[in-house]
Regions:
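M16 family metallopeptidases and their MPP-like homologs
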Residues: 29-40, 66-175, 195-200, 207-211, ...
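Zinc-dependent metallopeptidase catalytic helix centered on the HExxH motif
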Residues: 46-47
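Phosphate-interacting basic helix/loop segments used at nucleotide- and nucleic-acid interfaces
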Residues: 54
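Conserved active-site loop region of the serine DD-peptidase/beta-lactamase
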Residues: 62
Length: 345
């Protein structure tokens, strides 16, 4: 066992004025990326900031979607509040639509105007209902796979010294109030300074959002170690078996297959089902014989186009209304086209 490792200090960042930076890349569309330093993992303000990010840029009911994507000024716009081991950042990004004629500077102004709109609009009750349902659902759905269980247990043990921290995590988000969201908005985002990065296609530096006013310094990982291999005390493990011998093979492990049931109806519909009690969730998969193999030879891509259109407005609901209803349930519907089937999941 090595020496005990102390928890590192959580750094506190302060940016005294907006830092504009840019880079060229082998990309087709330009990108505007705005980020603000916030708090650390599981800080009391982390959950309200997560809720704020969802209100501003989470799905088709968000403000940025309304002001950028629905207006066809951008092909993508989103907001996130990711956390690493020691710190979190509040990030807003958008990719201008090439046919809109909007520059990165225009997109930045729309984003800043959206923040002003949010302050005037405030937090609505539906905002909290949607975000809290989505957050709880993401925790629960994350437990449906072995990797999801292991990841959550390991992360909770590492950062909270409690592998079963999921209940406290869900409670953190359920306890967020409208006042909490407005408080963190005014503390970390409103009138605060951040880093604004323009990523543009090669040779288009003239299209950046604003002139660069900051040059990042060289990154250093510290001085090189002068320790030689001869100075290291090697601890050799002791085996209780002979590694030169191939172990004998045992009996094949039986696979625990869930019990399935099937029902065939007179109209030709067949249902295959099973029950799992690991999580309180229900999953439905509808398979329709309308995949790529059913396309006419001169109309390749029709199935994929149909699948995409199913996610848009219907005669009874707009795309925003569908998204809002699903978010309040903590549910999702995905439609995709495979070779044989159109899949509704």
């Amino acid at each position: 066992r090595g020496p005990e490792a102390a928890m590192p200090e959580k750094p506190v960042f302060e940016i005294v004025k907006d830092r504009y930076i840019s880079m060229e890349d082998n990309v087709h569309l330009p990108l505007l990326y705005m980020t603000y330093p916030t708090v650390s993992l599981r800080h009391e303000d982390e959950a309200p900031l997560d809720v704020l990010s969802s209100i501003l840029g989470g799905g088709k009911t968000s403000l940025l979607y309304k002001n950028l994507v629905k207006t066809q000024f951008a092909v993508q716009a989103q907001v996130g509040h990711p956390c690493a081991e020691l710190s979190c950042t509040f990030s807003l990004l958008a990719l201008p639509h090439p046919a809109s004629g909007k520059s990165l500077a225009d997109v930045e102004k729309i984003i800043r105007d959206t923040l002003v709109e949010f302050e005037q609009r405030g937090v609505e009750e539906d905002d909290l209902l949607k975000v809290k349902a989505e957050m709880e659902a993401s925790f629960v759905f994350g437990l449906q796979s072995v990797s999801g269980k292991v990841s959550q247990l390991a992360a909770n043990q590492t950062f909270s010294n409690n592998p079963n921290y999921i209940a406290q995590d869900i409670a953190r988000y359920n306890n967020v109030t409208k006042e909490d969201v407005m408080r963190v908005f005014k503390k970390y985002i409103k009138d605060q300074h951040g880093v604004i990065m323009s990523v543009v296609p090669d040779g288009q530096l003239n299209s950046i959002s604003a002139e660069n006013n900051f040059v990042p310094g060289p990154r250093s990982a510290g001085g090189e170690s002068s320790t030689s291999a001869d100075e290291l005390a090697v601890r050799k493990g002791t085996d209780s078996f002979d590694r030169s011998l191939i172990p004998p093979s045992g009996a094949t492990e039986a696979v625990d297959i869930p019990e399935m049931w099937r029902r065939n109806f007179d109209n030709g519909i067949s249902i295959l089902g099973t029950q799992s009690l690991e999580t309180p969730t229900t999953s439905l998969l509808l398979k329709i014989s309308a995949g790529h193999y059913f396309n006419a030879k001169d109309k390749a891509g029709t199935a994929a186009l149909l699948a995409s259109m199913f996610g848009e407005s219907t005669t009874e609901r707009s795309a925003e209304e569908m998204s809002k209803a699903l978010q309040k349930l903590g549910s999702s519907v995905t439609i995709s086209a495979g070779n044989h089937y159109l899949n509704v999941n």
